[in-house]
Design a protein with these regions (language model features):
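Extracellular/luminal immunoglobulin-like beta-sandwich modules
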Residues: 98-100, 104-127, 167, 208-210, ...
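Solvent-exposed loop/turn motifs of extracellular immunoglobulin-like beta-sandwich domains
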Residues: 3, 23-30, 39-41, 85-89, ...
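Extracellular mucin-like PTS segments
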Residues: 237-271
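Short, structured motif recognition centered on aromatic/hydrophobic residues
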Residues: 46, 76-79, 90-94, 147, ...
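N-terminal V-set
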Residues: 37-76, 154-186
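Extended, solvent-exposed segments with strong compositional bias
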Residues: 80-84, 189-194
Length: 271
């Protein structure tokens, strides 16, 4: 399973705040921390271990920025860091999680001649049986791709989304749905969340070769945590590559359709 969480936290020098994060084996987390504008040019880093006023355990750096390395991705193994200086936030992406990654981490800003500002992140990585870790889909150009992703019941009330990955950014393009049994559309992507069934349905219509990519199904809590649950690999082929005409893919209704009907009840066949 995949996960990826987003945390928005204000770090104050000399003050330790703590959050708990659940990740899924095979997934990842995105941790987003805010900082005071006066620390825009300071080094940002992410480390594993305890960090208290009286350090009894070393916090080993996993990834860090250089000064003036703002608005650029920094990559190191399974980690990526991006410092959005205009918004005074930086994000840490932690991919390909395993249960061995469970532990204590720190999201921090390096402050010279003073206590660094940091937030303790307690990460617990588990394996969930409800959902697939990865699925592969294919469609002919001009057709539609239907995505179905299950999620843990504990996330039923959360916002659901499908993100398209671009390089280090697991969520370069996002379409989300905030209500149960209502379609939400953005561009060629439409989403439908059935919270009773814990099932997220997505439809990408009129696909082209440009839609061949890695996508992620996930959830976002009201605290801003983003959890990437299932990786979806989509391959779009030319019509000439298919051995026989494929059946027409169903399409979703507009987002204004009634919320009482299921996705399949509201789909119509494209001509």
């Amino acid at each position: 399973m995949k996960i990826i969480w987003t945390f928005t936290l204000l770090m104050i020098p000399g003050v330790v705040s703590s959050i708990s994060v659940t990740g899924y084996s095979g997934g990842g987390v995105i941790i987003t921390c805010t900082y005071d504008r006066k620390y825009t040019d300071n080094t940002k880093y992410f480390c594993r271990g305890q960090k208290t006023f009286i350090q009894t355990e070393q916090c080993s750096d996993l990834i860090k920025t250089d000064k003036k390395n703002d608005n650029k991705w920094v990559n190191s193994g399974r980690f990526s860091l991006f410092d959005y200086t205009r918004a005074t936030v930086f994000t840490v992406t932690f991919r390909d999680l395993s249960e061995q990654d469970s532990g204590t981490y720190q999201c921090a800003v390096d402050i010279s001649l003073s206590e660094d500002s940091y937030t303790e992140v307690n990460l617990k990585v588990v394996t969930a049986d409800c959902c697939e870790k990865s699925i592969s889909l294919s469609a002919a150009a001009g057709g539609s791709v239907n995505i179905s992703c299950r999620y843990p019941q504990s996330h039923s009330a959360d916002v659901k989304f499908v993100c398209r990955r671009s390089g280090s950014d697991l969520c370069a393009e996002e379409t989300s749905v905030k209500e149960s049994r209502r379609w939400s559309a953005e561009g060629q992507m439409q989403l439908y969340d059935d919270r009773e069934q814990q099932l997220l349905t997505g439809i990408i219509s009129h696909v082209t070769q440009q839609h061949s990519a890695e996508y992620w199904c996930g959830v976002q809590s009201d605290q801003g945590h983003k959890s990437f649950i299932t990786r979806v690999l989509i391959r779009v082929t030319d019509v000439s590559e298919t051995s026989s005409p494929s059946s027409s893919s169903p399409s979703s209704p507009s987002s204004s359709s009634s919320s009482a009907e299921s996705p399949l009840q509201r789909m119509c066949v494209r001509n």
